[in-house]
Amino acid sequence: MSRDFSREKRLLTPRHFKAVFDSPTGKVPGKNLLLLARNNDLDHPRLGLVIGKKSVKLSVERNRLKRLMRESFRQHQDSLVGWDIVIVARKGLGDVENPELIQHFGKLWKRLARSRPTPEEKSEPAGVDSTDA
């Protein structure tokens, strides 16, 4: 899988965001943010960002956060295959320094990847049932 952040790896329409908000299968709270995820049945993850003016006042800070989030996602997307992910920023996130944010996102991606049941666990019982039948 390529490590780019092309258009196909973004949540673009309100419908995509609504699907994740309405029925998240994974939820990882973090410091000053919330990470929501939903299975997407694709061979790549997709990312959506919600950073409002109420949470982070200055556009410079909002843009910095978006750059850091996208870059962290791009670097960790191999472990996030099959998720639609929405990151919701909360008050105070703009005050966190870059190195701390990068480290924090690394931990969040790992927690999200661990929360997904592995495909082997899903297919094993089906395989056992089909061989017995």
From Swiss-Prot:
Protein name per its UniProtKB record: Ribonuclease P protein component
Function recorded in the entry: RNaseP catalyzes the removal of the 5'-leader sequence from pre-tRNA to produce the mature 5'-terminus. It can also cleave other RNA substrates such as 4.5S RNA. The protein component plays an auxiliary but essential role in vivo by binding to the 5'-leader sequence and broadening the substrate specificity of the ribozyme.
The keyword Amino-acid biosynthesis belongs to this UniProt entry's keyword annotation: no
Keyword Nuclease in annotation: yes
GO molecular function, one term: ribonuclease P activity
Gene: rnpA
Gene Ontology biological process terms from the UniProt entry: tRNA 5'-leader removal
Catalytic activity: Endonucleolytic cleavage of RNA, removing 5'-extranucleotides from tRNA precursor
The entry's keywords: Endonuclease, Hydrolase, Nuclease, RNA-binding, tRNA processing
Pfam families on file: Ribonuclease_P
Source organism: Pseudomonas syringae pv. tomato (strain ATCC BAA-871 / DC3000)
Coiled-coil residue windows: none
